[in-house]
């Protein structure tokens, strides 16, 4: 009798571990989105229609010197690719301000390292 309960306990434990592991994997995949449009050097749109502004950087606004190059660089990095989004908050333009990762590498840092964006330590979410 004790052996039967022991076997049932092990089987139930394995089942629960598999169930919860699969649930964690599903939850993790919810943070990944495909980039469908790059608006400028620090903003893009995902397959869900969400507008994302990359946290902690400031790229030239469209029409200013370097703006098209910054947009093109960001596009080459992430357009039509899956990125991980770690959301922070919405800004005054209703964009989600987020850290963005491509294959585990910070897109925020790549934009600054490339020279097409500057680090922005501003705590304000109103920064355009």
Mark where each language-model region is.
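Small beta-barrel nucleic-acid-binding modules, primarily SNase/OB-fold domains
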Residues: 2-128
């Amino acid at each position: 009798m004790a052996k039967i309960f022991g076997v049932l306990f092990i089987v139930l434990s394995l089942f629960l571990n598999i169930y919860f592991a699969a649930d964690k994997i599903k939850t993790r995949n919810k943070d990944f989105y495909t980039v469908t449009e790059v608006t400028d050097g620090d903003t893009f749109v995902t397959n869900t229609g969400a507008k994302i502004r990359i946290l902690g950087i400031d790229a030239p606004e469209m029409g200013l010197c370097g703006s098209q190059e910054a947009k093109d660089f960001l596009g080459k990095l992430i357009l039509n690719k899956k990125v991980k989004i770690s959301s922070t908050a919405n800004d005054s333009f209703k964009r989600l301000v987020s850290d963005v990762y491509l294959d585990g590498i910070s897109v925020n840092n790549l934009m600054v390292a490339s020279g097409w964006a500057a680090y922005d330590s501003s705590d304000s979410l109103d920064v355009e």
